[in-house]
Amino acid sequence: NSSIRQRIIAQFHEWMTGAGLLYLKSAMPQVGCVFTTHATVLGRCVAGNNLPLYSEMKNYVPEELARRFNVISKQSLEKTAAHQADCFTTVSEITATECAHFLDKEVDLVTPNGFENVFTPSEAEWEGKRKAGREKFLQVAQAILGRPVAEDALILGISGRYEFKNKGIDVFIDAMGQLNRNNGLGKE
C-alpha cells in the first residue's frame, strides 16, 4: 500500500541481489531501485585468474568471457539489474570503466568507497578500543584452539569477500607461513 508520494528507495549491492531488484521493479514500480556494484562479475574473473584487466579490457568480449569462466547467469543477472535500475552506481571511476565495458551501461553516479572520519575513534578513545578488540580476538583464539593463548601472542585477522587472489588471501597465507617458520618475533 505505498504511493509515489512516499519516496521509497531500495538499495541493491552486487549481482546476487539482482533478482530482488527485478522482482521489486515488477511488483512495486513506485519504489526507486538503486543497483551498486563494487566490481563486475567478469572483472573479478579476469583478475582472479591473473589476467590483465584494465590494460586489456577493450579486447575482452563480455559474452565470450562469461562462457569461458562459466558465469553466464551471474553476468546476465548483473547486466540486467544494471540496465533495469533507476540509478546504477559503482564505487570508483576505474570500476565505472569496467561497468561500461562489461555491462554495456554507464553508471549514473560514482559513490566512493571508504569510511567517514566519524567511524574512526578519536585519539583519546583509540587505545581503549584497540585493547578491547585485542581481548575479543584472544577470547576467540582460545575458544577455537581450546587452550589458553599468551597475552602477547601475535594476533592477525583478515576479512572481506572470499576471493583468494583478488583480495590477497594467498599472499596473507604465505606471509603467515613464513612468520610461522621463521618465528623471528619470538611470540606465540
Spans of model-derived segments:
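Catalytic cores of nucleotide-sugar-dependent glycosyltransferases that transfer UDP/GDP/TDP-activated
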Residues: N1-E188
